[in-house]
Amino acid sequence: MAAVNDMPGPITVLIVVPTLDAGAADVGAVELVRILERTDHRAIVVSRAGRLVADVIAAGGEFVALDVDTKNPLRMLSNAAVLNRLARERGCSVIHALGRSCAWSACIAARLAGIPFVTSWYKGFREQNLFKRLYNSVMARGARVIATSEQLAQLVNDRYGTPWEKIAVVPSCIDFQPFEPGKVTPERIAALRKSWGVQPSTRIILVTGRIVRRKGHHIAVQAAKRLMELGLTDFLCVFVGEDRGHTGYTGDLWDLVLSTGTMDVIRMAAPVGDMPAAYAAADIVVSAAIQPEGVQRAILEASAMARPVVVSDLAAGPDVILTAPAVPESRITGLRFAAGDAAALAAALLRLLSMPEPEAAAMGQRGRAWVLGHFNTSVGTEQILRVYGEIVPRTGQPAVLPRAH
């Protein structure tokens, strides 16, 4: 294995990401810029413009606007030519793609430029047909394939036969400084509760994730219905994600809320700018994903804020949330349920809502200690630089790229 600094000097990484808004890959691109810039390397980010462009620039990266979020083959080829030229002009050592829609252009450009191609997986992808499988397969064609969780690494190996020596597990890592429970003032918490219309005695279940079907908000609604049937009414499920144009699913959710009679315990709130306060206001934080996810930043952030978490078995692996029977009950940092099983989610929520406050607080503190020790930026920096060090040639000559399988 290459050493962390086993590179021929400072390198320039061309990071290609479909958008720079709020998704896991978008935020991951910004964190990658921070890692590179603070270790005396250089980052160039190519993407469609978005709210995180300012963060890229503030972190020391260079931003190049290009609409790489496309499935049009002609546009992909055109983008590949632009990326190839950019990589050659700026002396890039690696092209790193953080999404499928941009990865084909990035892959072609890397081959044209004679430099390594790297991909990062932040979630699993559905493959309804052979065309979809081919489209997704570009994410397994890198000289290194980075998976943000052990679950995703296993998926890449199982689905595409990618050799384990080409797969690197590099979890999303967080700058935890803003997520310090003691730094969140009561006024910030009160302001959020007021904006959500929450009564003082009401307990908050914060449901994370953008409003898209794969995040499982409909499972949370069904679980809320089951809690009501058990006689619980002193809780409120707050959805704080954006729908980003997925109005069809949002409409389906509203229909489900109306048909289940859960209007009084479901709140579809606007996206929150003060997430540390949102976690602090919550009694429980939930991720109900029904498709494989990487290491979700929201779960790491919630754990850092010492909140008990409930996750589906596709939302976070055992490396993120410690649950029984993998660890003794005295060491668990949250609860896990079978993805798509509303009854199991309701049972997990009922257990936490019924738990004595000191016991729930202790669980939250264990979660905080775990994520701060295993998902901090120092760990992420070492891991990502090791990946680059393994593939960037020390001679400075173009790398010999492996043939796609």
Question: Which residue stretches match the model-derived regions?
Answer:
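Nucleotide-activated donor-binding/catalytic signature segment of Leloir-type glycosyltransferases, i.e.
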Residues: 250-270
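Carbohydrate-associated surface elements
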Residues: 151, 173
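Glycosyltransferase donor-sugar binding loop
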Residues: 45-51, 174, 208, 236-251
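Conserved acidic donor-binding segment of nucleotide-sugar-dependent glycosyltransferases
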Residues: 322-342, 351-357
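A conserved mid-protein helix/loop that constitutes part of the nucleotide-sugar donor-binding site
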Residues: 23-31, 203-226, 251, 343
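A conserved, positively charged/aromatic
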Residues: 111, 117-147, 154, 161
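Short His-centered aromatic/hydrophobic patch
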Residues: 97-103, 121
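Short hydrophobic beta-strand element within catalytic cores of glycosyltransferases
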Residues: 45, 308-311, 316-321
